């Protein structure tokens, strides 16, 4: 292997002066080439020859490669002049493959110049045919097939014209101004792509910039716009905002434009600021972009024609619909805007807020008026009530007097008392489970209305439901002081004390299943019947009380046989008063309930008999009709 390396080095040293036979003689076979590469890399510390295929890339790059070679030769000449020629020749003698692969006329070169040239060829030698750049995130093709960069391609696609290579534009130059010609000449002389001889390349945009002669702040408003502002809703007007944006951008460019002029800079001293003073002189006014067709400066949207010239929205739409340019006679000084444009909310003074609340302003100011009314309404609520608690944010537009409906829990229905005209509630039963104003089991009357008088008691919050659950056992303990209806049966009285404290509700399910007591049941139904319409009590009472009546007589046994007399006289039930009530006051109430029950049952029986008789007569009439039809 050592002999092979020595022979290869001698062969390369012998053919190094010649450049044409370098590549064919260096690769006799693939095995020899691999072995030589391994030996060279191991002997020289793993250094690779980056210029082995430079000749191949030279054929692919063409004209772009010639420019890079010229740059490399200039860099090499500068290095030779600085005294680096001797070290370069020594390094070239030590590495014959690098010297043999160098396509430049000079046989020796430094190691830094090939690396710099390889970085310049990162995109395989592509260059933009419009601006000449060699670096871009995306290479594009022009309609003619030329290679262009991403910026030039997007510019051409959007404006249908080539992207200008010089970025200095005299957009703030009035017509017929001598300073404009001076700035154009100075700018064209400093541009790398314009030598000042071609008048078409000076700046085409300066032809579309006109002087603004309309006084600012004279917009009539109300849907009409002249682009000057000063009216209600001008902050949200697209024509006004577009015009302000364009003028601000051009004023910023005007501050930096005269500084690049060599004529202005050579004047020296105070004369060097004449360009800035001239551009900011109020006599020249603000310059805006103008339409190529009608020369207007006010439009909600700037468009471009097929030549890339800026045109207003009206001319662009007219050309798009009719295929011809819009006649200049159709130009109007005021633009009619649609009502769908929402203006920006501006701070209003108190008089304007008063007008907006009365609805006397234009529709454009309605959003700002609503916002101001909303704030004033919230302030009025805080001042009027003076409680230091602002209204909830979820309902800012409702009156503060409207309270949220309390929770509706029908399981605690017995703890609430319904106030009726003929049955006023007692003071001991006025319990407020939703109030926190009870101390040691004692209740106090508050100003809050009962729950059934509220508007929408269907929803409740989590806090209110938790308060209700915590207060429900206390309410059940307070109700235990109600006097018992049937003293001889303590279990029934204790179980019936809670569900019967509210006369407006039937017994609970537990009391119906466990049959708490005869007298208690009759008394409850008696009070229920007194609250029901008399016309309906006779129909409802027998259905609900018939099973209880049978249970009552079964429990009485042989003490009193049941009597079903249609008579309305209260004398016969006196025989049953002693066994049921035991001679107490509760027994008298039970007797009255039995009498009412018998009277209702008799009325029910008589009505059923009448209905049955009517049905029989109707059936006979239908049978006669059938007989006649047959």
Curated annotation (Swiss-Prot):
CDD domains xrefs: ZnF_GATA
Compartments where located: Nucleus
Outcome of substituting residue 128 to A: In gzf1; decreases both the number of zinc and iron ions bound and the ability to bind DNA
Coarse class of the protein's main subcellular location: nucleus
Stretches of the chain forming a coiled coil according to its record: 595-630
Superkingdom, taxonomy of origin: Eukaryota
Keyword Magnesium in record: no
One GO term describing the cellular component: nucleus
Chain segments carrying region Cystein-rich region (CRR): 219-237
Keyword Zinc: yes
Effect on the protein upon substituting residue 291 to A: In gzf2; decreases both the number of zinc and iron ions bound and the ability to bind DNA
Entry GO MF terms: DNA-binding transcription factor activity, RNA polymerase II-specific; RNA polymerase II cis-regulatory region sequence-specific DNA binding; zinc ion binding
Inducing stimuli: Constitutively expressed in high-iron medium, whereas expression is reduced approximately 2.5-fold when an iron chelator, such as deferoxamine, is added to the growth medium.
Gene3D superfamilies according to UniProt: Erythroid Transcription Factor GATA-1, subunit A
BP-aspect Gene Ontology terms: negative regulation of transcription by RNA polymerase II; positive regulation of transcription by RNA polymerase II
Ranges of Low complexity composition bias in the record: 436-447, 492-503, 558-568
Zinc finger map (GATA-type): 128-152, 291-315
Disruption phenotype: Impairs the repression of siderophore biosynthesis and utilization genes in the presence of abundant iron and thus produces siderophores even under iron-replete conditions.
The protein's role, per its UniProt record: GATA-type transcription repressor that regulates iron- acquisition genes through specific binding the GATA sequence element 5'-(G/A)ATC(T/A)GATAA-3' of target promoters in an iron- and zinc-dependent manner. Regulation occurs via direct binding of iron ions. Iron acquisition regulation is critical for survival under both iron-limiting conditions (to acquire essential iron) and iron-replete conditions (to limit iron toxicity).
This protein's domain notes: The conserved cystein-rich region (CRR) localized between the zinc fingers is also involved in DNA-binding and transcription repressor activity.
UniProt name for this protein: GATA-type transcription factor SRE1
């Amino acid at each position: 292997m050592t002999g092979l390396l020595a022979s290869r080095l001698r062969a390369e040293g012998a053919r190094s002066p010649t450049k044409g036979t370098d590549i064919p003689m260096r690769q006799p076979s693939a095995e020899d080439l691999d072995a030589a590469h391994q030996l060279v890399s191991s002997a020289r510390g793993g250094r690779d020859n980056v210029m082995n295929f430079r000749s191949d890339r030279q054929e692919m790059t063409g004209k772009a490669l010639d420019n890079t070679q010229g740059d490399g030769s200039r860099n090499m000449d500068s290095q030779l002049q600085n005294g680096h020629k001797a070290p370069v020749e020594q390094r070239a003698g030590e590495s014959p493959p690098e010297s043999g692969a160098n396509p430049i006329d000079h046989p020796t070169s430094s190691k830094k110049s090939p690396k710099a040239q390889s970085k310049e060829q990162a995109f395989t030698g592509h260059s933009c045919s419009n601006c000449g750049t060699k670096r871009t995130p995306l290479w594009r093709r022009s309609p003619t097939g030329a290679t262009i960069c991403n910026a030039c391609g997007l510019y051409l696609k959007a404006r249908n014209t080539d992207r200008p290579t010089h970025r200095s534009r005299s957009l703030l130059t009035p017509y017929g101004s001598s300073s404009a010609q001076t700035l154009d000449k100075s700018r064209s002389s400093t541009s790398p792509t314009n030598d000042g001889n071609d008048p078409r390349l000076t700046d085409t945009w300066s032809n579309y910039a006109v002087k603004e002669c309309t006084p600012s702040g004279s917009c009539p408003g109300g849907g009409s716009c002249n682009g000057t502002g000063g009216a209600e809703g001008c902050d949200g007007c697209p024509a006004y905002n577009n015009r302000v944006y364009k003028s601000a951008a051009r004023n910023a460019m005007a501050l930096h434009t005269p500084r690049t002029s060599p004529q202005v800079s050579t004047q020296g001293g105070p004369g060097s600021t004449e360009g800035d003073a001239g551009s900011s002189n109020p006599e020249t006014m603000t310059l805006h972009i103008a339409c190529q067709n009608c020369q207007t400066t006010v439009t909600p949207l700037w468009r471009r024609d097929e030549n890339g010239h800026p045109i207003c929205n009206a001319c662009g739409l007219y050309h798009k619909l009719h295929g011809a340019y819009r006649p200049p006679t159709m130009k109007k000084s005021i633009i009619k805007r649609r009502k769908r444009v929402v203006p920006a909310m501006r701070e209003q003074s108190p008089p304007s807020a008063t007008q907006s609340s009365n609805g006397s302003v234009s529709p454009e100011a309605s959003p700002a008026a609503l916002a101001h009314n909303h704030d004033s309404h919230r302030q009025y609520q805080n001042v009027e009530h003076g409680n230091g608690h602002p209204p909830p944010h979820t309902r800012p537009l409702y009156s503060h007097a409207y309270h949220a409906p309390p929770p509706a829990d029908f399981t605690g229905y017995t703890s609430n008392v319904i106030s009726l005209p003929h049955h006023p509630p007692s003071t001991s039963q006025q319990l407020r489970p939703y109030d926190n104003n009870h101390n040691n089991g004692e209740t106090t009357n508050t100003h809050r209305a009962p729950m059934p008088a509220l508007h929408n008691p269907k929803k409740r919050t989590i806090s209110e439901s938790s308060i209700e659950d915590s207060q429900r056992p206390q309410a059940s303990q307070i109700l235990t002081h109600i006097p018992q209806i049937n003293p001889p049966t303590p279990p029934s009285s204790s179980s019936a004390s809670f569900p019967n404290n509210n006369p407006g509700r039937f017994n609970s399910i537990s009391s119906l299943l466990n049959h708490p007591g005869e007298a208690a049941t009759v008394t409850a139904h008696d009070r229920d019947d007194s609250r029901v319409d008399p016309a309906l009590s006779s129909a409802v009472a027998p259905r609900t009380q018939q099973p209880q009546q049978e249970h009552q007589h079964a429990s009485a046994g042989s003490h009193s046989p049941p009597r079903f007399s249609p008579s309305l006289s209260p004398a016969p039930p006196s025989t049953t008063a002693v066994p049921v009530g035991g001679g107490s006051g509760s027994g008298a109430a039970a007797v009255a309930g039995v009498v009412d029950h018998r009277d209702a049952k008799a009325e029910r029986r008589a009505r059923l008999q009448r209905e049955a008789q009517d049905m029989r007569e109707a059936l006979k009439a239908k049978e006669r009709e059938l007989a006649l039809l047959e």
